């Protein structure tokens, strides 16, 4: 919506689609038709601590009771779907699960710290909903999404492809009195999980058997078909932003066309030109001898070793093993570059 995240829609993002549809529908249902049931979904840490209502840690942290929070979090989840396409549904779900669990612990710590140091009681006033993992996604968004300037205002200030996302996050951050506690706990959990602190990414993860089960049962329900009638250009808010996005698209297409042209020429001309200086080897080739008395060219270096773990990650995203191997070799084992290359083709 706001950033260049590949194809529009929810193609290759079934988990993001389910997080958009199910909690939003339940939030509307509770607000319009079942307001008397909202008390069951109140996020009340005081009741959890004193009355042992442990179930509130689950029910109170899934569905938003404020429609403004529902709207803002849905927009953010839609824009953060790029991480599901990049990492795969299993790793994306593991990140959300890990940050969701860790943020509950940080909520307790922050509430107790406020009570101890400042005498502020916030245990019964925390906002409900799937908010902490949404704030946690700002950590990989800040660290891994490149910043592209699209306009410059007031001297050093500039508008980038990430500005509107940060503004939307700020709107969600200021939508309630104590939502900043949930936001800080979400950011802290995102930092812990993204930096692999204390190996939490190995403990709080989705098992492979569970991922396969949901891929067989729920993924067909929430999967979306590949868009066919689009130019793969993000729709900017102004003509200048759209023009900048088209220029970025042309640059990417030029790079990929040069890459493909180099591959074709290398296959046709063999070893007459050492294309390995320009492009990493994609396939192992046999040495080719040319004119009888002419000394053959130096042997091409062996193909780059590819990590099977990275191949497995790309295959979990839906790519074939051959395409995954070729993209990883072409990108010198850079998983992010290989993923972006495959998503563009």
Swiss-Prot record:
Question: What are the entry keywords?
Answer: Endoplasmic reticulum, Glycoprotein, Membrane, Signal, Transmembrane, Transmembrane helix, Wnt signaling pathway
**Localization of this protein:** Endoplasmic reticulum membrane
* Residue spans, topological domain Cytoplasmic: 113-125, 185-345
Per the UniProt entry, the signal peptide is 1-35
Checking InterPro entries in the record gives: Rhomboid-like_sf, UBA, UBA-like_sf, UBA_UBAC2
According to the record, glycans are attached at 161
Source species, domain of life: Eukaryota
Q: How does it sit in the membrane?
A: Multi-pass membrane protein
Any single GO BP term? Wnt signaling pathway
GO CC aspect terms:
endoplasmic reticulum membrane
Kindly list the residue ranges recorded as spanning the membrane: 92-112, 126-146, 164-184
Molecular function per GO: serine-type endopeptidase activity
Q: Which SMART domains match?
A: UBA
Which residue intervals are topologically Extracellular? 36-91, 147-163
* Domain (UBA) ranges: 305-345
Q: How does it assemble?
A: Interacts with LMBR1L, FAF2, AMFR and VCP.
Report the protein's function: Restricts trafficking of FAF2 from the endoplasmic reticulum to lipid droplets. In association with LMBR1L and E3 ubiquitin-protein ligase AMFR, negatively regulates the canonical Wnt signaling pathway in the lymphocytes by promoting the ubiquitin-mediated degradation of CTNNB1 and Wnt receptors FZD6 and LRP6.
Instruction: Report the PANTHER family cross-referenced here.
Output: RHOMBOID-RELATED PROTEIN, UBIQUITIN-ASSOCIATED DOMAIN-CONTAINING PROTEIN 2
What's this protein's name?
Ubiquitin-associated domain-containing protein 2
This protein's species is Macaca fascicularis
Q: Which gene encodes it?
A: UBAC2
């Amino acid at each position: 919506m706001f950033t260049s995240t590949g194809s529009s829609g929810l193609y290759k993002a079934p988990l993001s689609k389910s997080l958009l549809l199910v909690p939003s529908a339940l939030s509307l249902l509770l607000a319009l038709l079942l307001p008397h049931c909202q008390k069951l979904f109140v996020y009340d840490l005081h009741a959890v601590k004193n009355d042992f209502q442990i179930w509130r840690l689950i029910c109170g942290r899934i569905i938003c009771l404020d429609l403004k929070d529902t709207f803002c979090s849905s927009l953010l989840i839609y824009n953060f779907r790029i991480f599901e396409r990049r990492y795969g549904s299993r790793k994306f779900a593991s990140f959300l699960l890990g940050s969701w669990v860790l943020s509950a612990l940080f909520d307790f710590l922050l509430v107790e710290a406020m009570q101890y140091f400042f005498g502020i009681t916030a245990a019964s006033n925390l906002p409900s909903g799937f908010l902490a993992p949404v704030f946690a996604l700002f950590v990989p968004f800040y660290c891994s999404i490149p910043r592209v300037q699209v306009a410059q205002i007031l001297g050093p200030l500039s508008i980038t492809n990430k500005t509107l996302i940060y503004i939307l996050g700020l709107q969600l951050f200021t939508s309630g009195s104590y939502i900043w506690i949930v936001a800080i706990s979400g950011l802290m959990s995102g930092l812990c999980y993204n930096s692999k602190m204390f190996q939490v990414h190995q403990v709080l993860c989705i098992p492979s058997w569970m991922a396969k089960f949901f891929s067989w049962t729920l993924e067909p329900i929430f999967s979306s078909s590949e868009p066919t009638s689009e130019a793969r250009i993000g729709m900017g808010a102004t003509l200048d932003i759209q023009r900048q996005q088209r220029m970025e698209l042309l640059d990417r297409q030029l790079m990929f066309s040069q890459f493909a042209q180099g591959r074709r020429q290398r296959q046709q001309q063999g070893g007459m030109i050492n294309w390995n200086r320009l492009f990493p080897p994609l396939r192992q080739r046999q040495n080719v001898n040319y004119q009888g008395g002419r000394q053959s060219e130096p042997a091409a270096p062996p193909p780059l070793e590819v990590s099977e773990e990275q191949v497995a990650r790309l295959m979990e995203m839906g790519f074939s093993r051959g395409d995954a191997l070729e993209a990883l070799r072409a990108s010198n084992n850079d998983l992010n570059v290989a993923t972006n290359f495959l998503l563009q083709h």
